[in-house]
Amino acid sequence: MINKIKNLINLNNLDGYIVPKNDEFFTEYSKINKLEIVANFSGSAGFILILKNSNHLFVDGRYTIQAKQQSEKKFIIHEIPYEWPKDILKNDARLNIGFDPKLFTTETLKIYFNNSCNLFPVNSNLFKTRVEKINKDNLVYRINTSIVGESSKSKIIRLKKILESEILDNLFISSGENVCWLLNIRGKDLPNSPIANFQAILTSNKNVILFGNIKKLKNIKKEFLKNKISFYKKNDFFKILSSLKGKSFCIDGKTCSVFNEKLISSRFLIKKRVDPINDLKSIKNNTEIKNMIEAHIKDGVAVTKFLYWIKNSNFKKLDEIKVEKRLESFRKQSKKYLFPSFDTIAGSGPNGAIIHYRSNIKSNRKLNKDHLLLVDSGGQYKWGTTDITR
């Protein structure tokens, strides 16, 4: 993949190209770990800068050890926030750096480069995914009000009032997480999180327009139409945008890509602010609080069974991978359990000191009564998410 990127650099008369961890929805998780493909780095955060004569991997302090181990000396490791691309480019003549405009925001580019180079958008499709087959296992589904405590209709009304109070005509909801919260929907587009990858617009006439893979809406199309929620393919975004009324458009600078910002700004006056849904969803109602407690009780039962099993097992026959699988089996005993909320960290001895460690065939260690065992894990349940470390 490094050679492919360097070919892209040469074809476009560039001096470098930057690769982020995120996908176009800017969530923590994505189906493809681009950093692992390029640098063999499996951590959950970071980015890569490929120059003609050097390769650079930027990670935070959690991952410096892991990055050095996995990148196999093919990359220079930089620790953020102490080093950014702008710091290694400042002594060069202004270089031409390419980026995918669907994977970066203007705010992120400013932090990384701060006018230290010339930036060029390149629609590369370097990490183009296969066309996903739609089946009953990856369809979008609705969450009952009994679980979330508030109907989507009520949430939309509250959101409308915020826009009206700030004299904003349209709102672009670029975060898939926020779309799921607003419409009380869930999906299976990401590992470890029940998110459906959709974006939406709340229009000046207060209708909701959804953009994404509409084939996944098969089971809820009728309900959406009944509630005046329309839906289109991602490629229809600009066409729909051109038909909207109003003068202003609110976007979240942290999750609206350079690509979408340019499309919106060609037609509307942009107002940047944190997506108001962020505040709305962070204040939990009584039903959500009750269900979160219930999820932690169920998860606590699973972890208690696991700890009892560990205490009464023969350590000589156990290793990190066996521990991880056994803990998962206890969680699966609950009918409301969905899947892990993140990759389980089961680190024996020195492996427990590696932040966000993930055991594999090469690193898997046997348990030892004289060594600490760190287990950091969590579960996604139908009514809550957990994270527990022991």
Which residues fall in each region the model found?
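Terminal amphipathic helices with adjacent charged low-complexity linkers/tails
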Residues: 115-134, 256-291
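Short, charged beta-turn/beta-strand-edge "cap" motif at the junction between a beta-strand
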Residues: 24, 103-105, 178, 255-256, ...
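N-terminal accessory/capping or targeting/presequence segment of soluble
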Residues: 1-92, 104, 108-241, 298, ...
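Short, compositionally biased
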Residues: 112-113, 385-390
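Amphipathic alpha-helical
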Residues: 15-19, 317-342
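Generic, well-ordered alpha-helical scaffold segments in large soluble proteins
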Residues: 4, 8, 12, 115, ...
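Conserved catalytic alpha/beta cores of large enzymes that bind or transform nucleotide phosphates
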Residues: 220-275, 281
